[in-house]
């Protein structure tokens, strides 16, 4: 038996499709539209109802938990909070101010104190991790490699507990991801007419717990790169969630984009 804490993005849906009917599980559905509500093993609760969540785990005699998908940082003044939530809420709010990585670490620690072990988010889906190498026909040139170096350098300088998992480097200019996500980052850059240049680097946050919240990319990410006039996408060895692999590589080859894993 495993407890699945599911948030937004297609990653939880992929896990669900793979394990349904094969594994014993239950779902804590934190999606806005309650995507998993039709599953009889799904529970809809508030992030602040920690006591209820822990009670469900104990009722199911479940000792393992898997986090997948994005959970939007809640408005703490409006969420439902139970007694155990009240006990933990001040620590959660304090850590949330340090960034997503610190908040997730605190939540993992809370479950650990309740003797519930957090497993890697790719426990059921190791095929979504990519190893080092180039996955498309197109390869980065000398200028692309300079852009890659600059983007990685900028990410390494970022605070260990912040939300930054992505950077776009183009012509010695860096655009960093904010807590609004990758899509918002793309809105900040303009396509240079008839010229392809620049790269998107998606790495985990510095010193984050790699069991949760790995950067998720896929076909939509590559389409955003193409629309922005970028040359390619750079990922970290076995530290990303890569969805739509076959379609993504086909799209990259068709549009002369590189997919590099370092």
Positions of predicted regions on the chain:
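Conserved mixed alpha/beta catalytic, RNA-binding, or beta-rich assembly cores of soluble enzyme
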Residues: 11, 97-101, 107, 114-226, ...
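Short secondary-structure boundary/hinge segments and terminal tails
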Residues: 21, 36, 75, 129, ...
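N-terminal glycine-rich phosphate/adenylate-binding segment common to multiple enzyme folds
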Residues: 53-124
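Short coil/turn connectors at secondary-structure junctions
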Residues: 1, 21-24, 61-63, 114-116, ...
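N-terminal basic/disordered segments at the start of proteins
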Residues: 1-30
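Feature captures the catalytic cores and cofactor-binding loops of soluble hydro-lyases/lyases
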Residues: 31-37, 42-55, 59-62, 80-92, ...
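Gly/Ser/Thr-rich loops at beta-strand to alpha-helix junctions
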Residues: 6-11, 70-74, 172, 240-241
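General beta-strand structural signal in soluble alpha/beta enzymes
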Residues: 4-6, 27-28, 65-68, 118-123, ...
């Amino acid at each position: 038996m495993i407890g699945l804490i599911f948030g937004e993005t297609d990653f939880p849906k992929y896990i669900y499709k793979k394990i349904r009917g094969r594994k014993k599980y239950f779902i804590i559905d934190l999606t806005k539209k309650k995507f998993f509500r039709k599953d009889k093993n799904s529970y809809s609760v508030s992030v602040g109802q920690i006591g209820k969540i822990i009670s469900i785990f104990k009722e199911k005699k479940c000792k393992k938990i898997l986090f997948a998908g994005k959970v939007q940082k809640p408005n703490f003044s409006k969420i439902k909070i139970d007694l155990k939530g009240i006990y933990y809420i001040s620590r959660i709010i304090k850590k949330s101010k340090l960034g997503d990585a610190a908040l997730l670490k605190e939540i993992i620690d809370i479950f650990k104190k309740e003797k519930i072990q957090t497993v890697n988010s790719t426990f059921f889906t190791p095929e979504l991790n990519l190893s080092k190498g180039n996955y498309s026909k197109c390869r980065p040139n000398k200028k692309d490699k300079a852009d890659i170096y600059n983007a990685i350098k900028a990410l390494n300088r970022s605070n260990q507990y912040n939300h930054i998992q992505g950077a776009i480097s183009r012509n010695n200019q860096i655009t960093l991801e904010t807590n609004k996500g990758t899509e918002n980052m793309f809105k900040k850059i303009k396509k240079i007419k008839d010229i392809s240049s620049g790269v998107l680097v998606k790495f985990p946050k510095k010193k984050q717990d790699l069991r949760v919240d790995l950067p998720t990319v896929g076909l939509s990410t590559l389409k955003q790169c193409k629309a922005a006039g970028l040359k390619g996408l750079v990922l970290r060895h076995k530290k990303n969630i890569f969805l739509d692999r076959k379609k993504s590589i086909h799209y990259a080859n068709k549009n002369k984009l590189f997919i590099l894993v370092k």
